[in-house]
């Protein structure tokens, strides 16, 4: 999976809320499940308040967006 800084994804959660994920950091020295740092916004545009870390396993569940 090719991920770049600036890529954006949408996670469609089971509770019906869509979360916007903006990749802000990629660190190959982190564990596989924490490789990508991202800002996360809820469906109302509210920022989660901290960078969250994900791996390819999570991003494969998300939809990559064009913008």
Predicted feature locations:
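Short coil-to-beta transition motif at edge beta-strands of beta-rich domains
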Residues: 2-14
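N-terminal cationic leader/targeting segments used for protein routing and processing
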Residues: 3-5, 26-28, 47, 62-65
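N-terminal non-cleavable signal-anchor helices
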Residues: 4-6, 24-25, 41, 52
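Acidic surface patches and DE-rich sequence motifs
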Residues: 11-13, 30, 42
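Short beta-strand-centered aromatic/proline hotspots
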Residues: 18-28
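Short aromatic-glycine-enriched beta-strand elements
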Residues: 33-38
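Intrinsically disordered, low-complexity, charged/polar segments
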Residues: 40-67
